[in-house]
Each structure stands twice: as C-alpha cells, then as structure tokens.
C-alpha cells in the first residue's frame, strides 16, 4: 500500500512538472507575440523627446486630452482696442463698470469695456491610419547649415537610390523637425521603415537619421467652448476723432490709473475705424 501511494505521488509530481514547463512555454510564446512589431505596426516608431511640464497629485482625475502649442485667433472689430494687463484682478474690476469715460483735451470719450471671449477646443477625436507610401525622416541635429530646399534635395537623392534601399520619390515636405517623403512604390516605404536607421551625408558629415511610418490623421469630432481671456479686455465704441498712435497713448494712460479701476498695462493695440484686426493668443506655458 505504501509503495502504491509513493508511485502515485511520484506520477503526480511528474505531471505537475510537465504542466509547469508547458505553462512557461505558453507564457513565453505570448510575450513574443505581444512584443512583436507585427502585432501593431510592423515598423519602428520615431523617437520624440517629451518634457513633463504639469503637476502630479493623488486623487485627481487624469486629463483626457493634451493640447500643445495652443494658438487662438480672435478678430478685432474696427473702432476697438485690445488691452492686456499683468494682473487679472484689473480685468475683473474694469468689467464691473461697462462704460468708461476717457478724458481728452476738449471732450470725453464714452467707450464700452467688455470681456474677450476666446474659442477653446476642449475635446477632439482624431482617426489615424498609416500611409503605406510615405515615411517620416527624423533625427536631424541642430545647427545644420542647409536651407530647407537643400535638405529636401539631399534626402530625395539619397533615398531615391536603390542601393540605399530607396526608390522613386514622388512627394516631399518639411515638417516641424522632420521630413515626410512619399514613394511611388509602397514596398520601398515599408522596406525603409523596416531598416529604421540610415547614415546620410549632410553638411559634410554622416548623420544618423531614423525612418518610421507616416501616420495621417483626420479630425472626426471637436468640441469648442468659449473662455474669457483672464488678462485682457476689449474696448469698443471708439469714435474716429484722432490718429491711432495718439489714441493709443491716451487709452494706456487712462487704463493704468488705479482710480479708474486700471493697473499696469502689458500691451495695448488700437484698431482704427475702417480697419480690421486679428489678435493671436497663446497658452501661458508655451
């Protein structure tokens, strides 16, 4: 009876070891398939430097989107002025009194002060897909003494040669820090991406460049809301009674006086009658 139990126990131990080995094999196979470039896009991804400029706090909701280098264009009507203050509290004080009287030598100007509402994208959905005929070339060092046209010419010549793995270049475009190249044969683009890195002669030196897939995107949905500019107000209803420079100085003096509810003016732009203006706002962190 004891021998039988030992035999059964030994058989169970062997079966357990065999199953454990099989499990390890399956886990290794899963890791290989998951880590394989072919599981997603069969090419290398361009190396893009990222810099964290935000805050980390526990218990806070993670943002669903990030907007980089935000620029908002705001049209300015004729007979108006855009006034920007260093302290946003000045804006709050001025908006409590919509009509302001600006003293001139012989009369007073009655102008309207109103908040500046800016359209801001709060959510955006973009569909993206690889372009099989195009590649993205990156890794250009700073200080290259080549014009944009010279750089594009040299890249077209290099990647247009079959000995370099290239082919007929149909399109080329300079992007921000990168170059897009489009080829007539999609197999050429795929082959270049599979190689990934090339030493290209540029500006009397061999530069190691990276080639990765070009992904095109299309905006499917965008949500926009209007947000008040915290540091600026729009002054309207300005009559055509003097030249723009003189009016600029008078308005700056008026809105710098604390007795008028004003404060330190950071910038002031006047749009005379018969003209149109365009103000471009950027994020404070950019």
Swiss-Prot record:
Region of interest called Leucine-zipper, as start-end residue ranges on this chain: 5-26
Post-translational note: Phosphorylated. Dephosphorylation correlates with the formation of a complex with NMI.
Observed effect of gene inactivation: Knockout mice show decreased inflammatory response when exposed to infection or injury, which can lead to lower inflammation-induced mortality.
GO cellular component, one term: nucleoplasm
Residue intervals of the NID domain: 81-170, 183-266
InterPro entries associated with the record: Nmi/IFP35_dom (IPR009909), Nmi/IFP35_N (IPR009938), Nucleotide-bd_a/b_plait_sf (IPR012677)
One GO process term, biological-process aspect: innate immune response
Cellular localization per UniProt: Cytoplasm; Nucleus; Secreted
One GO MF term: identical protein binding
Keywords: Cytoplasm, Immunity, Innate immunity, Nucleus, Phosphoprotein, Secreted
Role of this protein: Acts as a signaling pathway regulator involved in innate immune system response. In response to interferon IFN-alpha, associates in a complex with transcriptional regulator NMI to regulate immune response; the complex formation prevents proteasome-mediated degradation of IFI35 and correlates with IFI35 dephosphorylation. In complex with NMI, inhibits virus-triggered type I interferon/IFN-beta production.
Subunit structure: Homodimer. Also interacts with B-ATF. Interacts with TRIM21. Interacts (via NID domains) with NMI (via NID domains); the interaction is direct and is facilitated by TRIM21.
Family per record: Belongs to the NMI family.
Record's comment describing the protein's domains: The NID domain 1 is involved in the negative regulation of p65/RELA transcription and the negative regulation of NF-kappa-B pathway activation.
Identification of the protein by name: Interferon-induced 35 kDa protein homolog
UniProt source species: Mus musculus (Mouse)
């Amino acid at each position: 009876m004891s021998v039988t139990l030992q035999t059964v126990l030994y058989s169970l131990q062997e079966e357990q070891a065999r199953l454990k080995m099989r499990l390890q094999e399956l886990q290794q196979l899963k890791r290989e398939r998951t880590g394989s470039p072919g599981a997603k896009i069969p090419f290398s991804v361009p190396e893009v430097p990222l810099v964290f400029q935000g805050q980390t706090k526990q218990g806070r909701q993670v943002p669903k989107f990030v907007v980089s280098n935000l620029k908002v264009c705001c049209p300015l009507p004729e007979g108006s002025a855009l006034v920007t203050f260093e302290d946003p509290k000045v804006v709050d004080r001025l908006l409590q009194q919509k009509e302001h009287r600006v003293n001139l030598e012989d009369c007073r100007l009655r102008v309207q002060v109103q908040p500046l509402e800016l359209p801001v994208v709060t959510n955006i959905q973009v569909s993206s897909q690889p372009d099989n005929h195009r590649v993205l070339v990156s890794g250009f060092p700073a200080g290259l003494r080549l014009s944009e046209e010279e750089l594009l010419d040299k890249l077209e010549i290099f990647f247009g040669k079959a000995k370099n793995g290239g082919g007929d270049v149909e399109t080329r475009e300079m992007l921000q820090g990168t170059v897009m190249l489009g080829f007539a044969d999609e197999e050429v683009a795929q082959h270049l991406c599979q190689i990934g890195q090339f030493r290209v002669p540029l500006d009397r030196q061999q530069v190691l460049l990276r080639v990765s897939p070009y992904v095109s995107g299309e905006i499917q949905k965008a949500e926009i809301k209007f947000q008040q500019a915290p540091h600026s107000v729009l002054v309207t209803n300005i009559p055509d009674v003097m030249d723009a420079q003189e009016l600029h100085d008078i308005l700056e003096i008026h809105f710098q006086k604390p007795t008028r509810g004003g404060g330190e003016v950071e910038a002031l732009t006047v749009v005379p009658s018969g003209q149109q203006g365009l103000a471009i706002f950027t994020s404070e962190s950019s």
